[in-house]
């Protein structure tokens, strides 16, 4: 999974990136400090994997990972190539979802590229640039589909109609992700390289005092929260500066720091949970003396396709999956006891994987 961290210059996105990846991207109080996207790979915390590693004592423990990309700050006109627009748009196209960092604090010492704090305006600026880039691309798709449709190709004619409907929606200043259409048409749009169709998490970046005192009464946060609700997006209240402090601590010091702040989970943990929920992702686990590993799949994935995540041969020669729910395995204390109690099931090719399935795939090629 790849998440693109975007936002206007000086809203805190590089600070947030540093916090969650400890990558040390340069942070400066001026536009375009992040010219090339910084990339960081973050392990997904999973207590289930930790438990299995304790049980099996494998040579290697491999968590699932998320790739974060800190993408250059955007300004008006990016869709026309202004600022770093062209590079910004190509980088965002390669991501699975967008983490849109929105400034929700006043600070006269940190300049805002638009001169004032207004989260709804900031969101609109980036949304509009993505929409304008999509309009240009969709117009080309309409022309291509319409041309193919002249020969009587019904699927091309249908594509052209779908794209025309979306174009009207985009011309109203609305993003592709809010376009109402059938599941079949949605699948077509999701394979069309649209920017504004990508799922969004709004990271509402608060100052330390507001974050500590309670952000529910912050007018800026309320604006972002209400907008996210209207779009079916998610909002994550966060303080990038606090997260950066957490990221600089040793692991055993972090829990104490969080407790002092009255926070149960770090922003990174909450962001990962948000990402999995937004993209409909779950994890299954494999374990043995060589390796214990967590694998990320889309909810609804069947056993053969999950096996293919490990190796294409596993999917091609799939025979069955031997599965036990993690909670059942933990309650039993060992795989041997789980088998004695009949909790290890043999599942076929139509089995839909569940979050936390501890799995052994049987295959033959």
Task: Give the role of each language-model region.
Residues 32, 46-49, 62-68, 82-96, ...:
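Amphipathic alpha-helical transducer elements in NTP-driven molecular machines
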């Amino acid at each position: 999974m790849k998440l693109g961290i975007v936002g206007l210059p000086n809203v805190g996105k590089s600070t947030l990136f540093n916090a969650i990846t400890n990558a040390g991207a340069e942070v400066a109080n001026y536009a375009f400090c992040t010219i090339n996207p910084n990339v960081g790979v973050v392990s997904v915390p999973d207590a289930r994997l930790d438990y299995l590693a304790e049980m099996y004592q494998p040579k290697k423990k491999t968590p699932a990972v998320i790739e974060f990309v800190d993408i250059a700050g955007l300004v008006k006109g990016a869709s026309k190539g202004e600022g770093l627009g062209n590079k910004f748009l190509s980088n965002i196209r390669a991501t699975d979802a967008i983490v849109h960092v929105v400034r929700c604090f006043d600070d006269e010492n940190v300049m805002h590229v638009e001169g004032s704090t207004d989260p709804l305006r900031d969101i609109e600026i980036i949304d509009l640039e993505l929409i304008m880039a999509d309009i240009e691309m969709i117009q080309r798709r309409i022309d291509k589909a319409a041309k193919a449709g002249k020969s009587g190709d019904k699927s091309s004619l249908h594509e052209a109609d779908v794209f025309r409907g979306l174009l009207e929606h985009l011309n109203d200043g609305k993003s592709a992700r809010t376009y109402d259409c059938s599941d079949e048409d949605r699948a077509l749009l999701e394979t069309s390289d649209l920017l504004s169709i990508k799922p969004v998490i709004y990271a509402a970046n608060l100052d330390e005092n507001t974050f500590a005192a309670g952000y529910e009464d912050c007018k800026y946060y309320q604006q972002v929260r209400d907008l996210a609700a209207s779009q079916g997006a998610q909002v994550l209240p966060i303080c990038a500066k606090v997260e950066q402090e957490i990221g600089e601590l040793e692991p055993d010091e972090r829990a104490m720091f969080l407790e002092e702040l009255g926070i149960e989970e770090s922003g990174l943990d909450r962001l990962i949970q948000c990402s999995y929920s937004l993209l409909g992702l779950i994890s299954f686990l494999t374990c043995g003396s060589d390796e214990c590993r967590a694998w990320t799949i889309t909810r609804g994935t069947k056993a053969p396709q999950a096996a293919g995540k490990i190796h294409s041969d596993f999917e091609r020669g799939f025979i069955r999956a031997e599965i036990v729910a993690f909670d059942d395995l933990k309650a039993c204390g060992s795989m041997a006891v789980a088998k004695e109690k009949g909790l290890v099931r043999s599942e076929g090719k139509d089995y839909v994987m569940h979050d936390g399935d501890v799995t052994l795939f049987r295959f033959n090629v």
